[in-house]
């Protein structure tokens, strides 16, 4: 890097150096999208059918704590069951608010169950939290497409087919899979299956007995945990995080024996004579809970000898506070709207990641009364952080934030308190006071739209009645006016305590801490990955086998065990346990309730709409930090609304507001520091941000525009610059990369560290990468290189300490994070040249898309490296998936496997001990190669199963992945095999024609009635046929694999490698031939008309079902020639049917006449449901896409990645069509017949067509054919010359005629090197084009010389076909028909001389057979080389008299000078004026017989005279330049040829005779008196007209020229 002298450094020189290095300073063209909350990956591409369920060894592979996980599995599942039930009952709770009075009696059981689970997981909660979060993160990373939904729909499709097996399954005590695999919005259900919850603690035990029992259980279960007697009396506020304001509901199982009336939609199954009621779609009513017998399942266990009853609906108090100005609550519906934004802004959206963590509190007021008629107190319980399940709100993406419960506002979350150990417990009185304060502070911030209801907690807790009463009253009085508070008691039957109750009681006692103990979990703990990493294939398999509880589809369903709203007396009676009859509501009461509900829904809708509007108004000008505070003072609001505010604003927002340029604070401060002469780094930067002047200017900058260029003190300017980067919401180096920086900082191998850091910097956006380069360039040039005041090491250390922590910030401000930032900046400054300037890679090319560097072209090795790279996915998220799906275009699977194995071994760390590995640590390349191989296998394992050698190679190259890949690469039965409809056995060998089976009995039916007497006996209707045809085609369509579509785009479909696709492509032809066969198989015209009517209705119904394959095939059959010629049949077809055919054709225009620009995109946009595309048309469209986009670059060394992305998008769209909703039709016997349908060949169809309606010969009057006037050969040549270049044979003829060209033009130059290269076809073509370019212009000659090799390299095989490349060169470089070069070439091809040969054969030498003798020569000259006077001129010169020579000698010198001047003037005029061009073709012909008596040979030429612009042919000239006979040639042949060529001979002297003796030497031969024999000698010339002694060969025209 060329550095500037620090002493002479100036801002002008610096910005010039930045411009020379092509560092971007304007980002107006860069797409910058407003950041949004981080959303989940949108569904892009679903993998194929999941593999079989993993074995136990595969599940526990790589996990050192597998035994521990197994031992705690029950505890984790209990929590997950509660969480999943909570999530699934939200809508139900909202729709049944009127039933809260009757349902609150279930609160005790529900909360007791939750406490039991929390206490049971107390010891191992940290580990389980990491395990759950790791599993969730793994699922989010790998399941980018949510492909499990496709297989759930597969199971739902077969629900009706398995009804007859229900009785058998009931007897076998199994569960039906089709009732389990339903849609679910809870992501927890996709990770862990729900299990049975432990029974609840019965109510009614004595208080003292409860205390003693809890103390004994605590000592037995956890003797090592210290506890006090006051633990059982301590209560605290239960504070959790949530992102919704609606009241949550919890589903739990109880052991009550209350008699309830099941609703009409409840289902029951029998188990040992007992009734099992299981949760239905809405999560509240029972439904059939059977499982498919194809998948093993344990029988539903009993709990304490009682079968699990229906779940109870419980309402809990939910108090939500949202940090926003003006108290506006941001609900989930509004926050989810950000998911619609493009993924291209994901990097910039991380600026709000740490600031958008909204703090929402959920207070659960729980208490258990001693007796059913006691007052229900409210107790606030505070579990420790370790007992909070990390997956409670996984679907909402919430984060537990630190909460200051002592704050009066409840919205400020900035203060934190250190956690208190569990051993230091508070006293009961103190705990109660803190509880009351916490509850009051929380309730004070309750939103207007929130609803509060009291619930209960564990009944084993000792309650301080006085303190509890205070808390309850506080919560009740501070709730807003619109919130509803309900209270009830628990109805249950006393039962002895179970072990789970004892554990729950103990956990409640030991887990009670103060509210200050709640702390924010660190990001490291959240992002820590589980060692038992499982790929998407195994996850999908396990997901399908788990229980999915469907969402509620009807909001007005009544939960199990509840009744419609009744009076208060009924509520009191039910609370006391006395069963009361249901109160029947009158019609007026029902209408009133209905109106209230509708009004409430309308009000909620309006409130949500208002909240959304307020949110947009807030986030329009305010940053996330401002919105988070919740309360904004007028002064702060003034700052937020100020247009001059630059501190604390996103960098991208500042760039947008400055028209794409860098903000003034950056350019002006760098300019001031550049012009400053102060070089002492310590005095300029260290501690500059703490100067009072800096703080004052910083404060003023929020309300007024600051001109930083007029500030004279460089230290103040430096402090403002440091403060600017310190207050950026998102640091210059995105905080999401900070974890990668920490890992890079730990690497000790310098080369590996620099390579990883370079790749990570390239992952930044263009704005951040360019700004970082500008700043480092400035620091290096101004203060480091050539600094005479400060040494280099001290300068780097000072700059790194000042700017490192500001450029590179993590989630915490620990000393370790600060040190990482300092060391990273030092590393960047020391290796600036390597990280920023040496960016050109010879085997890869990048392009800038939305500020990210995306690969446009690359070699195969480089693409493999990027597909397994650690940091490139930051730039292009789905590049690895794109690479592995489309690799068939440029590399075979076996070669790809070899390259991956080689790359893995190169990056594998072979050091065994951890100490050595840490010392010589390398990059994580090997682990990412493993993930890439798993991804490849997940999406292409079907093809790998068929290729056993490839499977063995992958397993042998990656033996450590055998446990995870073996199940996918083996040939075991998978779940996909169970989900397929079993094919029924049948013995049908051929298809049944409608004519044979139906029309003879009059059994054809249609949608409008029967035809041909079949109204009453309608066996098949058009709709039934269309449905079965659709099922047949859809089955073929869905079985086509991902790689098969890639092969279809590529154009190579092999039945062995792509059997499903091959059958699908044949199906289009089969349907067309089948329809034609059905029409032509009967000789009765009325039956043919009936079949045509039926087929038209079938096609229309298929089109309505989106089965375009069958619909278009039938349309093709009806428009085929063999069907259209049946005139008598079509005359009998009703007009209504003809109109239907016209309408059908119009509705299929998208397929029949595809769009020229983007046919595939138009077709995909027109489809929004399950469909079957027409495979033949789809193949044509995809092949056109392949032809338009080249696979490789011009030189063939790099792969065109843009084509791979295009194909990947096509595959995604096709698979989207494959995964649309399934058809609900049921296969019938016709389905099997249509699968094995046989068709008739086209030849047989032609015969049948003639048999149905034989051709009628009509007697026509004979008309003598008119005389055809033969077109003149000159006119044919003119028409050929006027044709466009693409329709001529120039591309074929030029390569084989290039060696025959001869040029005699002015300015033509041929170097010795070019002459030596003659003989090579490519070189000959090049020299011909260069010579023709010289005729036109020197610029064209330069373009031809420079660009010819880019289209046709010199190394091209001469025997290869490069016609397209040659025509492309003539079109793009030589400008096609607009160029003189191309017009000349159009006169030099076979089509020009073909009319001349026909003229000589049929007209000139008629009756004399001859053949081509070879030797085609082309002469191009701007001089008329006509040979009409060549020999005659020579004879005149020989016969000149000596007197003429003397006269010339006696002429005066003046006359000679005048003649010379006149000739020079004529030459100058000719040079100034455009000269015409003459093109002459020489061609030889000879006799067909090789005998001397029949021998003759002649050479003719055709001369074309072109104008100066070569646009028109001015004249034609056909001559015979040479005619040779043998001395033994028969006189008849000789005289006939001489007579035929008499007017075409150049001269009589061109006739020659040859004597064929043994030596083949020419000898004297007699000639006719009309022949002139010329003998030329140096001494004298004798002309004799009678005899000839020597026969001289005529001089070739080229020699004469």
Swiss-Prot record:
<dbReference type="InterPro" id="IPR056651">
    <property type="entry name" value="GlfB-like_C"/>
</dbReference>
<feature type="compositionally biased region" description="Low complexity">
    <location>
        <begin position="1465"/>
        <end position="1474"/>
    </location>
</feature>
<feature type="domain" description="Ras-GEF">
    <location>
        <begin position="1021"/>
        <end position="1255"/>
    </location>
</feature>
<dbReference type="GO" id="GO:0001965">
    <property type="term" value="F:G-protein alpha-subunit binding"/>
</dbReference>
<dbReference type="Pfam" id="PF00617">
    <property type="entry name" value="RasGEF"/>
</dbReference>
<dbReference type="InterPro" id="IPR000198">
    <property type="entry name" value="RhoGAP_dom"/>
</dbReference>
<dbReference type="InterPro" id="IPR001895">
    <property type="entry name" value="RASGEF_cat_dom"/>
</dbReference>
<feature type="compositionally biased region" description="Low complexity">
    <location>
        <begin position="475"/>
        <end position="493"/>
    </location>
</feature>
<dbReference type="Pfam" id="PF00618">
    <property type="entry name" value="RasGEF_N"/>
</dbReference>
<keyword id="KW-0009">Actin-binding</keyword>
<dbReference type="GO" id="GO:0032486">
    <property type="term" value="P:Rap protein signal transduction"/>
</dbReference>
<feature type="region of interest" description="Disordered">
    <location>
        <begin position="1443"/>
        <end position="1474"/>
    </location>
</feature>
<dbReference type="GO" id="GO:0031252">
    <property type="term" value="C:cell leading edge"/>
</dbReference>
<dbReference type="GO" id="GO:0005737">
    <property type="term" value="C:cytoplasm"/>
</dbReference>
<feature type="compositionally biased region" description="Basic and acidic residues">
    <location>
        <begin position="578"/>
        <end position="596"/>
    </location>
</feature>
<keyword id="KW-0597">Phosphoprotein</keyword>
<dbReference type="Pfam" id="PF00620">
    <property type="entry name" value="RhoGAP"/>
</dbReference>
<feature type="region of interest" description="Disordered">
    <location>
        <begin position="475"/>
        <end position="630"/>
    </location>
</feature>
<comment type="function">
    <text>GpaB-activated, rapA-specific guanine nucleotide exchange factor, involved in the regulation of the balance between Ras and Rap signaling at the leading edge of chemotaxing cells. Spatially localized activation of Rap and Ras induces F-actin polymerization at the leading edge of chemotaxing cells through the Rac, PI3K, and TORC2 pathways. Also acts as a key regulator of actin-driven membrane protrusions during processes such as phagocytosis and cytokinesis, possibly by modulating rapA signaling pathways.</text>
</comment>
<dbReference type="InterPro" id="IPR023578">
    <property type="entry name" value="Ras_GEF_dom_sf"/>
</dbReference>
<dbReference type="GO" id="GO:0008603">
    <property type="term" value="F:cAMP-dependent protein kinase regulator activity"/>
</dbReference>
<feature type="modified residue" description="Phosphoserine">
    <location>
        <position position="197"/>
    </location>
</feature>
<feature type="compositionally biased region" description="Polar residues">
    <location>
        <begin position="57"/>
        <end position="69"/>
    </location>
</feature>
<dbReference type="GO" id="GO:0060097">
    <property type="term" value="P:cytoskeletal rearrangement involved in phagocytosis, engulfment"/>
</dbReference>
<feature type="region of interest" description="N-terminal F-actin-binding domain">
    <location>
        <begin position="1262"/>
        <end position="1601"/>
    </location>
</feature>
<dbReference type="GO" id="GO:0030837">
    <property type="term" value="P:negative regulation of actin filament polymerization"/>
</dbReference>
<feature type="domain" description="N-terminal Ras-GEF">
    <location>
        <begin position="851"/>
        <end position="983"/>
    </location>
</feature>
<dbReference type="GO" id="GO:0030175">
    <property type="term" value="C:filopodium"/>
</dbReference>
<dbReference type="InterPro" id="IPR000651">
    <property type="entry name" value="Ras-like_Gua-exchang_fac_N"/>
</dbReference>
<feature type="compositionally biased region" description="Low complexity">
    <location>
        <begin position="435"/>
        <end position="458"/>
    </location>
</feature>
<dbReference type="GO" id="GO:0070687">
    <property type="term" value="C:macropinocytic cup cytoskeleton"/>
</dbReference>
<dbReference type="GO" id="GO:0005085">
    <property type="term" value="F:guanyl-nucleotide exchange factor activity"/>
</dbReference>
<dbReference type="GO" id="GO:0061118">
    <property type="term" value="P:regulation of positive chemotaxis to cAMP"/>
</dbReference>
<feature type="compositionally biased region" description="Low complexity">
    <location>
        <begin position="500"/>
        <end position="520"/>
    </location>
</feature>
<dbReference type="InterPro" id="IPR008936">
    <property type="entry name" value="Rho_GTPase_activation_prot"/>
</dbReference>
<dbReference type="GO" id="GO:0031267">
    <property type="term" value="F:small GTPase binding"/>
</dbReference>
<dbReference type="GO" id="GO:1905511">
    <property type="term" value="P:positive regulation of myosin II filament assembly"/>
</dbReference>
<keyword id="KW-0206">Cytoskeleton</keyword>
<dbReference type="GO" id="GO:0051015">
    <property type="term" value="F:actin filament binding"/>
</dbReference>
<dbReference type="GO" id="GO:1904269">
    <property type="term" value="C:cell leading edge cell cortex"/>
</dbReference>
<feature type="compositionally biased region" description="Acidic residues">
    <location>
        <begin position="331"/>
        <end position="359"/>
    </location>
</feature>
<feature type="region of interest" description="Disordered">
    <location>
        <begin position="188"/>
        <end position="256"/>
    </location>
</feature>
């Amino acid at each position: 890097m060329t550095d500037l002298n620090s002493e002479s450094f100036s801002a002008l020189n610096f910005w010039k150096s930045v411009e020379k290095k092509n560092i971007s300073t304007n980002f107006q063209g860069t797409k910058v999208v407003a950041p949004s909350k981080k959303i989940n990956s949108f569904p892009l591409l679903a993998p194929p059918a999941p593999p079989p369920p993993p074995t136990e060894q595969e599940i526990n592979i790589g996990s050192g704590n597998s035994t521990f996980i197994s031992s705690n599995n029950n505890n984790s599942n209990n929590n997950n069951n509660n969480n999943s039930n909570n999530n699934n009952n939200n809508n139900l709770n909202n729709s049944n608010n009127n039933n809260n009075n009757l349902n609150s009696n279930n609160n005790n059981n529900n909360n007791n169950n939750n406490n039991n689970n929390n206490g049971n997981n107390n010891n191992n909660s940290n580990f389980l939290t990491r395990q759950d979060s790791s599993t969730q993160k793994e699922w989010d990373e790998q399941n980018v497409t949510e492909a499990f939904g496709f297989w759930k729909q597969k199971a739902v499709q077969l629900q009706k087919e398995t009804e007859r097996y229900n009785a058998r399954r009931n007897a076998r005590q199994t569960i039906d899979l089709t009732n389990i695999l339903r849609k679910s919005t809870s992501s927890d259900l996709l990770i862990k299956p729900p299990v049975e919850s432990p029974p609840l603690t019965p109510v009614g035990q004595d208080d003292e007995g409860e205390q003693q029992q809890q103390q004994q259980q605590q000592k037995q279960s956890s003797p090592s945990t210290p506890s006090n007697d006051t633990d059982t009396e301590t209560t605290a506020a239960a504070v959790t995080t949530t992102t919704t304001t609606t009241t949550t509901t919890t589903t739990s199982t109880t052991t009550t024996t209350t008699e309830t009336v099941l609703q009409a939609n409840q289902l029951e199954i029998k188990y040992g004579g007992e009734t099992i009621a299981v949760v239905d779609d809405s999560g509240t009513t029972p439904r059939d809970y059977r499982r498919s017998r194809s998948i093993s399942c344990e029988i539903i266990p009993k709990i304490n000898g009682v079968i699990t009853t229906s779940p109870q609906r419980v309402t809990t108090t939910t108090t939500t506070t949202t940090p926003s100005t003006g108290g506006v609550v941001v609900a989930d519906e509004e926050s989810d709207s950000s998911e619609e934004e493009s993924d291209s802004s994901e990097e910039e959206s991380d600026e709000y990641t740490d600031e958008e963590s909204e703090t929402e509190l959920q207070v659960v007021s729980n208490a258990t009364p001693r007796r059913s008629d006691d007052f229900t107190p409210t107790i606030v319980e505070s579990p420790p952080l370790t007992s909070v399940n990390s997956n409670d709100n996984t679907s909402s993406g919430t984060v537990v934030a630190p909460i200051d419960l002592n704050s009066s506002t409840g919205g400020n979350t900035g203060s934190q308190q250190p956690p208190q150990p569990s051993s230091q417990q508070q006293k009961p009185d103190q705990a109660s006071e803190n509880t009351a304060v916490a509850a009051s502070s929380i309730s004070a911030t309750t939103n207007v739209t929130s609803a509060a209801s009291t619930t209960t907690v564990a009944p084993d807790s000792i309650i301080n009645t006085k303190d509890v009463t205070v808390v309850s009253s506080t919560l009740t009085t501070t709730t807003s006016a619109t919130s509803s508070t309900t209270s009830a008691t628990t109805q249950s039957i006393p039962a002895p305590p179970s072990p789970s109750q004892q554990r729950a009681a103990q956990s409640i006692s030991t887990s009670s801490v103060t509210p200050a103990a709640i702390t924010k979990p660190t990001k490291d703990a959240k992002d820590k990955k589980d060692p038992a990493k499982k790929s998407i294939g195994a996850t999908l398999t396990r997901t399908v086998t788990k229980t999915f509880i469907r969402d509620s589809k009807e909001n007005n369903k009544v939960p199990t065990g509840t009744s419609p709203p009744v009076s208060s007396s009924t509520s009191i009676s039910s609370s006391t346990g006395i069963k009361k009859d249901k109160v029947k509501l009158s019609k007026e009461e029902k209408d009133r309730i209905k109106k209230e509900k509708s009004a409430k829904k309308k009000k909620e809708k309006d409130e949500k709409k208002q909240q959304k509007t307020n949110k947009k108004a807030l986030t329009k000008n305010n940053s996330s930090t401002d919105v988070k505070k919740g309360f904004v003072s007028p002064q702060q609001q003034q700052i937020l609304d100020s247009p001059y505010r630059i501190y604390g604003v996103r960098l991208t927002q500042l760039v947008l507001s400055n028209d794409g340029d860098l903000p003034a604070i950056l350019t002006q401060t760098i300019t001031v520091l550049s012009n400053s002469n102060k070089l002492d780094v310590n005095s300029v930067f260290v501690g500059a941000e703490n100067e009072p002047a800096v703080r004052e200017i910083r404060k003023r900058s929020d309300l007024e525009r600051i001109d930083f260029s007029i500030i004279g003190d460089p230290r103040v300017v430096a402090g403002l610059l440091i403060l600017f980067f310190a207050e950026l919401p998102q640091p210059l180096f995105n905080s999401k990369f900070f974890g990668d920086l920490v890992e890079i900082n730990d690497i000790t191998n310098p080369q590996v560290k620099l390579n990883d850091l370079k790749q990570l910097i390239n992952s930044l956006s263009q704005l951040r990468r360019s700004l970082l380069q500008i700043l480092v360039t400035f620091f290096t040039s101004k203060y480091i290189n050539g600094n005479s005041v400060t040494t280099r090491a001290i300068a780097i250390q000072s700059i790194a300490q000042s700017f490192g922590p500001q450029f590179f910030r993590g989630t915490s401000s620990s000393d370790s994070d600060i040190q990482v930032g300092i060391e990273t900046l030092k590393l960047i400054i020391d290796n600036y040249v390597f990280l920023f300037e040496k960016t050109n890679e010879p085997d890869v090319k990048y392009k800038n898309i939305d500020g990210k560097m995306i690969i446009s072209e690359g070699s195969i090795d480089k693409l493999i490296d990027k597909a397994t790279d650690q940091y490139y996915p930051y730039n292009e998220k789905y590049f690895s998936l794109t690479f592995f799906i489309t690799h068939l275009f440029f590399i075979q699977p076996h070669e790809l496997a070899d390259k991956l194995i080689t790359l893995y071994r190169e990056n594998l760390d072979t050091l065994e001990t951890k100490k050595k590995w840490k010392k010589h640590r390398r990059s994580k390349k090997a682990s990412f190669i493993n993930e890439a191989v798993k991804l490849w296998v997940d999406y292409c394992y079907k093809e790998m199963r068929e290729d056993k050698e490839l499977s063995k190679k992958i397993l042998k190259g990656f033996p450590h992945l055998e446990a995870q890949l073996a199940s996918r690469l083996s040939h075991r039965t998978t779940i996909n095999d169970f989900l397929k409809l079993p094919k029924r056995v049948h013995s049908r060998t051929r298809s049944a024609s409608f004519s044979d089976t139906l029309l003879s009995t009059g059994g054809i039916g249609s949608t409008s009635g029967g035809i041909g007497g079949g109204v009453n006996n309608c066996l098949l209707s058009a709709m039934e046929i269309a449905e079965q045809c659709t099922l047949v085609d859809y089955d073929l369509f869905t079985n086509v694999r991902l790689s098969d579509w890639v092969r279809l785009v590529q154009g190579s479909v092999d039945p062995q490698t792509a059997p499903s696709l091959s059958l699908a492509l044949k199906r289009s032809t089969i349907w067309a031939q089948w329809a034609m066969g059905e029409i032509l198989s009967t000789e009765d015209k009325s039956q043919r008309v009936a079949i045509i009517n039926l087929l038209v209705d079938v096609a229309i119904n298929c089109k309505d079902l989106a089965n375009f394959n069958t619909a278009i095939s039938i349309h093709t059959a009806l428009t085929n020639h063999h069907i259209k010629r049946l005139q008598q049949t079509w005359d009998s077809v009703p007009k209504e049917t003809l109109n239907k055919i016209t309408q059908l054709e119009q509705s299929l225009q998208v397929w029949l006449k595809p769009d020229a620009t983007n046919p595939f995109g138009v077709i995909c946009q027109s489809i929004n449901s399950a469909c079957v595309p027409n495979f033949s048309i789809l193949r044509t469209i995809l092949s056109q896409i392949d032809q338009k986009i080249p696979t490789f670059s011009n030189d063939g060394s790099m792969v065109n990645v843009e084509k791979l992305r295009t194909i990947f998008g096509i595959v995604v769209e096709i698979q989207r069509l494959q995964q649309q909703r399934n058809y609900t039709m049921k296969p019938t016997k016709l389905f099997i017949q249509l699968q094995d349908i046989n068709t008739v060949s086209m030849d047989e169809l032609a015969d049948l067509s003639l048999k149905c309606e034989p051709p009628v010969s009509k007697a026509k009057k004979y008309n003598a054919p008119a005389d055809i006037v033969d077109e003149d050969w000159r006119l044919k040549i003119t028409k050929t010359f006027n044709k466009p270049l693409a329709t001529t044979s120039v591309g074929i003829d030029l390569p084989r005629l290039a060696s025959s060209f001869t040029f005699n033009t002015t300015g033509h130059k041929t170097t010795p090197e070019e002459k030596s290269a003659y003989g090579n076809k490519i070189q000959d073509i090049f020299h011909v084009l260069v010579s023709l370019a010289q005729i036109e212009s020197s610029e064209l000659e330069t373009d031809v010389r420079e660009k010819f090799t880019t289209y046709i390299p010199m190394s091209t095989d001469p025997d290869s076909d490069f016609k397209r490349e040659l025509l492309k060169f003539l079109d793009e470089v030589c400008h096609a028909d607009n160029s003189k070069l191309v017009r000349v070439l159009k006169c030099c091809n076979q089509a020009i001389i073909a009319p001349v040969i026909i003229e000589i054969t049929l007209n000139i030498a008629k009756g004399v057979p001859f053949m081509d003798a070879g030797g085609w020569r082309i002469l191009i000259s701007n001089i008329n080389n006509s040979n009409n006077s060549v020999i005659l001129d020579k004879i005149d010169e020989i016969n000149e008299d000596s007197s003429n020579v003397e006269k010339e000698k006696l002429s005066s010198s003046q006359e000679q000078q005048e003649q010379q001047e006149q000739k020079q003037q004529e030459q100058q005029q000719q040079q100034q004026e455009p000269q015409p061009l003459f093109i002459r073709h020489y061609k030889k012909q000879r006799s067909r017989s090789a005998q001397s008596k029949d021998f003759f040979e002649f050479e003719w030429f055709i001369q074309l005279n072109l104008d100066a612009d070569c646009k028109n042919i001015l004249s034609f000239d056909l001559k015979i330049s040479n005619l040779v006979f043998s001395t033994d040639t028969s006189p008849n042949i000789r005289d006939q040829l001489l007579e035929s060529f008499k007017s075409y001979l150049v001269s009589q002297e061109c006739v020659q005779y040859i004597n064929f003796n043994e030596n083949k030497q020419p000898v004297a031969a007699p000639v006719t008196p009309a022949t002139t024999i010329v003998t030329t000698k140096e001494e004298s010339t004798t002309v004799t007209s009678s005899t000839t002694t020597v026969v001289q060969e005529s001089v070739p025209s080229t020699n004469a020229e």
